[in-house]
Swiss-Prot record:
Protein name, UniProt field: Altronate oxidoreductase
A biological process term (GO) from this entry: D-galacturonate catabolic process
Annotated keywords: NAD, Oxidoreductase
Keyword NAD: yes
Pathway of action: Carbohydrate metabolism; pentose and glucuronate interconversion
SUPFAM superfamilies (alphabetical): 6-phosphogluconate dehydrogenase C-terminal domain-like, NAD(P)-binding Rossmann-fold domains
Length: 483
């Protein structure tokens, strides 16, 4: 079977216009996939040079396949139909290992065609390292590497205003563009680079904050043989992802034209502020995940897919989103409902087996960040508590008993909560404390919640009553009132 390469698989090629820090699965099934579509359907004509930002030879370089690889996109489309598309991605030209090819890396700065920078160096990537020096080849941190590259460009083109870049980091931190910009400016100061360089950075380079959303399941180990037989070639960089994707960019409106987004209907939004979109994702997608996990797991289910196939639990999830989360969010209702439907389709994706216990990791923190804001806003706006969100809290407390149908299961959270719940539930079991006392202890932990939740009118009483029903009647019977 042939291995992918451009000689045996000829097709479109594009000049280098994009530098990408990060060779991982996510960017390849997200940014590179979108650029490939734009190259095919518009005159963007942009090739990508991938920079491997860490010193490792594993996995092998994309250059071993001349930058070619296959993206397999699968899930439920807008009509609820299961779809699968295999696409040979030609947008990546080559990969550079910055630790072996530093001169080739710096040469990119001298290419007048380079215009865009994308990155995904993980949440830990946009960080300061005091030890990084300008003379390092390369410096260790991503922002320092980028600063060195930008200075090379500034010098080569004598600070030309039209040679700045549009920088679009995709790391999962708030306002990632602003964070990256601040660190680049900090390195410029730390290294005592000319003031003219700092001025060029701020005036002629555009750092955009982004929000990225797509579940990328990566290399499909269990299906490789079947997929390669179907494709007719060997591909060491197969990459799988869900059907849904969303790319929100906080940046100038002209960016849509420059990226040719006005010529192809991709799910990319250029906005003035990404914050409402971040809140929407956290509240609806992540919030629904967090709400459903203890309810579904204690109802005898193990995956998100099983949850959505279960009439009772899926009804609970849908009503939680549409009746208690969406009404308190600050975006147009039609956008919120459309996003909600997309989320439910994603949960139903038959190609992804998402284990509930893996999502349950750090459930207490997830409840605080993903659900509590909507619970409190609902209570303030409506003058009453949202019954399903409080039920989700009661279910979460029940989940930390660590027992389902007489069998124990692993709990993953910080030691503080694991020890505390173990003590509290043992106290209830042996009659040393009442259920109301357990609930009050959990809700009054101001260090965790940022406030004393027992001060929220009726919250402790409502959660205690719901928890009592779960204990007495079982989750199935208890959730029936909210489905």
């Amino acid at each position: 079977m042939q291995t992918l390469n451009r000689r045996d698989f000829p097709g479109r090629s594009h000049p280098d216009k994009i530098i990408q820090f990060g060779e991982g699965n996510f960017l390849r099934a997200f940014v590179d996939w979108q650029i490939d579509l734009l190259n095919e359907h518009t005159d963007l004509n942009a090739g990508i040079v991938v920079i491997r930002p860490i010193d490792t030879d594993f996995p092998p370089s994309l250059s071993t396949q001349d930058g070619l690889y296959t993206a397999v996109i699968r899930g439920l489309n807008e009509q609820g139909e299961a779809v699968r598309e295999s696409r040979l991605i030609r947008s990546v030209n080559r990969e550079i290992n910055i630790y072996r090819q530093f001169d080739e890396y710096l040469a990119l700065a001298r290419d007048p065609n380079i215009r865009f920078m994308f990155s995904n160096t993980t949440e830990a990537g946009i960080a300061w390292n005091e030890a990084d020096q300008f003379s390092d080849a390369p410096p260790s941190s991503f922002p320092a590497k980028l600063t060195r590259l930008l200075f090379e460009r500034f010098e080569h083109f004598s600070g030309a205003a039209d040679k700045g870049w549009v920088l679009l980091p995709c790391e999962l931190i708030d306002y990632n563009g602003e964070a990256l910009r601040e660190l680049v400016l900090r390195y410029a100061s730390h290294w005592q680079l000319p003031a003219a360089f700092t001025q060029w950075l701020t005036e002629n380079n555009t750092f955009c904050s982004t929000l990225v959303d797509r579940i990328v399941t990566g290399y499909p180990r269990d299906e490789v043989a079947a997929l390669q037989a179907e494709l007719g070639y060997q591909d060491s960089f197969l990459d799988t992802a869900e059907y849904f994707y969303l790319f929100v960019i906080q940046g100038p409106k002209e960016l849509a034209q420059e990226l040719r987004l006005d010529k192809l209907d991709l799910n990319v939004r250029i906005v003035d502020d990404i914050k409402p979109y971040k809140e929407r994702k956290v509240a609806i997608l992540n919030g629904a995940h967090t709400a459903l996990v203890p309810v579904a797991y204690l109802s005898g289910l193990d995956t998100v897919g099983q949850t959505m196939d279960d009439v009772q639990i899926s009804s609970f999830v849908e009503k939680t989103i549409t009746e208690e989360i969406v009404p308190v969010l600050d975006l147009p209702e039609d956008e919120l409902l459309s996003f909600s439907q997309a989320v439910l389709s994603r949960f139903r994706n038959p190609f992804i087996q998402h284990q509930l216990l893996s999502i349950a990791l750090n459930g207490m923190t997830k409840f605080r960040t993903r659900i509590l804001p909507q619970l409190l806003t609902y209570q303030q706006q409506q003058g009453k508590l949202p019954p399903r969100l409080t039920f989700a809290l009661a279910a979460l407390i029940a989940f930390y008993r660590g027992e389902r149908d007489g069998q124990t299961y692993p709990l993953q959270d910080d030691a503080h909560w694991l020890e505390r719940y173990s003590t509290l539930w043992n106290g209830v079991k042996h009659g040393d404390i009442k259920l109301a006392e357990l609930v009050n202890t959990v809700l009054s932990d101001t260090a965790h919640w940022g406030q004393d939740l027992t001060a929220v009118p009726q919250l402790a009483n409502q959660v205690t009553e719901q928890l009592q029903t779960i204990i007495d009647s079982g989750m199935r019977a208890a959730v029936a009132a909210y489905s």
